[in-house]
Amino acid sequence: MLIADLPTYGYRRVHALLRRQAEREGHPAPNVKRVYRVMKIHGLLLQRHAGGGEERRHEGRVAVDVRKTRWCSDGLEIGCENGERVRVAFALDCCDREAMSYVATTAGITGEDVRDLMVAAVEHRFGRVNRLPSEIEWLTDNGSCYVARETRRFAADIGLVPRTTPLESPQSNGMAEAFVRTLKRDYVRVSPVPDAQAVLRQLPGWLAHYNEVHPHRSLGYRSPREFIQRSTHEGLSGN
């Protein structure tokens, strides 16, 4: 049932979910090699990606070691079976990978949408405040909705510091690009998307599952919320 519900998960992510279940129930965690063998026997391993052309890589490091110091944002388009399209913009924390906020529309993403996205992210992390207690970098590409003068001015007013990727290298915002691939692969492609309303209804559930369940290799195969909870607990305990 686990594999049937998550057909795009490889053996390491399946192992992470089984480990999480074992921890919750107080049982020993399964061995990752055993999970691999069982999935191989039953033909459940994912095929290796053959790869295409060489990808451009970000020369700097997008990820940070401290939460609430750098956020990144990007957008994606989801095509529906009836030809409608839903455009989504999102904000991630570059440490814990949580999808803090999103906006979605059947029109184009505007500067006003991005400003709403900023406010939602700030309120999610800090509550209703007029300005962040300390500045946070806001990493995006050079899309017009992000570089609009009013948007950049608004960002500065609330304590966000706009940072943009090189003009000819949108993939340098690698964390946001990875999130787009994850959302399309693990949620959109395995869900019914007959029309825009169906996508808009499912988006909150997809993002909740991503935040609560989806294991990240860079987080020790923990979900963003698991990572946040463990970080908070360790901070309170002084470890």
Where are these regions (language model features)?
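A short, conserved beta-strand element enriched in hydrophobic/aromatic residues
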Residues: 2, 72-124, 136-137, 165
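Acidic/histidine-rich, metal-coordinating catalytic segments
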Residues: 129-147, 222-225
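C-terminal domain-tail junction helix/linker
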Residues: 134, 156-160, 182-239
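Mobile genetic element proteins and their domesticated derivatives, centered on retroelements
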Residues: 14, 35, 74, 91, ...
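Conserved, non-catalytic sequence blocks in retroelement Pol enzymes and Pol-derived host proteins
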Residues: 6-8, 24-26, 65, 80-81, ...
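Basic, flexible linker segments flanking DNA-binding modules
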Residues: 1-70, 223-232
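RNase H-like polynucleotidyl transferase catalytic core
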Residues: 49-53, 104, 138-142, 157-175, ...
